[in-house]
Each structure stands twice: as structure tokens, then as C-alpha cells.
């Protein structure tokens, strides 16, 4: 009986964490994959992947990171 109650509580906690991210925010996270552009100070890939919005270029900050500036 305790195992069933524990499983139900864990399931409820996981569900509440999943619902914590609004649908609109989730869609914004994947805007680059849909062909949208990246705004200022967002990470980009100069050789491939999502492109920066007009007027911005993908600048390499260091070996591991590039941002739209």
C-alpha cells in the first residue's frame, strides 16, 4: 500500500514539473529549429543551424560559444 501511495505522489510531482514550462515558452525554445531567426545575445552556430535576425551576425566569443551580436 505504501508503494502505491509513493508511486502516485512521485507521478504527481513529475507531472507538475512538466506543466511548469508554459507551452508558449516551449515553442520559443524551438523557434530556431522551425527556421526562425535568433535575437541578440542568443547562442548561435556560425557554420550551420539557426541564423541571427537581420542586422546581427554570429560572433565567436571563444572556442565553445558564439552569440548573435
Curated annotation (Swiss-Prot):
Expressed by the venom gland. Disulfide bonds join 37-53, 44-58, 52-68. Its main location: secreted. Keywords: Disulfide bond, Knottin, Neurotoxin, Secreted, Signal, Toxin. Pfam families: Toxin_7. Residues 21-34 form a propeptide. Coiled coil: none annotated. It comes from the Eukaryota. It is found in: Secreted. One of its GO terms (molecular function) is toxin activity. GO terms for cellular component: extracellular region. Residues 1-20 form the signal peptide. SUPFAM superfamilies: omega toxin-like. The presence of a 'disulfide through disulfide knot' structurally defines this protein as a knottin. Insect active toxin causing rapid but reversible paralysis in crickets. No activity shown in mammals. Does not show effect on mammalian voltage-gated calcium channels. Belongs to the neurotoxin 01 (U2-agtx) family. This is U2-agatoxin-Ao1w.
